[in-house]
Amino acid sequence: MDSRNFLIVGGSSGVGLEIVNELKSQRDEIYVGSRTSDKLAGLERVHHLKLDVKEPPEHLEGLPDVLHGFVYCPGTIRLKPFQRLTRDDFLEDLQVNFLGAVHVIQACLPNLKKSPTGASILLFSTVAVTTGMPFHASIAGAKGAVEGLTRSLAAELAPRIRVNAIAPSLTDTPLAAGLLSSEEKRQAAAERHPMKRIGSAQDIARLALFLLSDDAGWITGQVFHADGGMNALRTFK
């Protein structure tokens, strides 16, 4: 199989870094857009592009002419009572989770359209969009916009470009460190899920790898719940 080119925004930590490592094992060329690159040092076929999604450029310098896939990983976890959320809280969550994705997709869409075999866009939502949870108003609103964007773009860009999203529950990554800072918190979080464990970065990355692959060539406009059963199941003991 010929080498492919992927852009992973937010690929320097957490789920994004795990996706980078999975793609790297397939000998693909990977372009990582992020603010930091410490964890990317020495990785073969991994190219770093300095990028802050709060201030995205109109043009992304350093990308190859053709992209076969794009993944947007940046996210926020801002859990507050609704009355304590400020306008700036809502705006920042929208900027990082939704508008950042919009800007980067617009910048790299010409590269994706040049893929001779079609391309794939993968975004990230959250289980909190479809499962109402207290203190999630801001992030659920921002990720709800991501789900709407996923379906709208999938319709607009078909059949050449597929667009899907993954909606995880709590995953063991640096972003969630504050929610998993003690063994008691980890156990309580695990118990809330029907599968009785917290998600791992690898759980999410392997689903992402499938959705980026030709094996998922008939899948578009979908939101996949990788959430330990939280969205769909109620286990009564």
Regions inferred by a protein language model and the residue ranges of each:
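Short, small/polar-rich loop/turn modules that mediate ligand/substrate recognition or access, typified
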Residues: A158-R162, I219-G221
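Active-site loop-to-helix junction immediately N-terminal to the catalytic Tyr of the SDR YXXXK motif
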Residues: L85, G132-A140, S152, K237
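N-terminal Rossmann NAD(P)H-binding glycine-rich loop of SDR-like oxidoreductase domains
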Residues: S12, V20
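Alpha-helical segment proximal to the catalytic Tyr-Lys
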Residues: P110, A154-P159
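Short C-terminal tail/terminal secondary-structure segment
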Residues: T220-K237
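Active-site helix of classical SDR
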Residues: I105, A142, T150
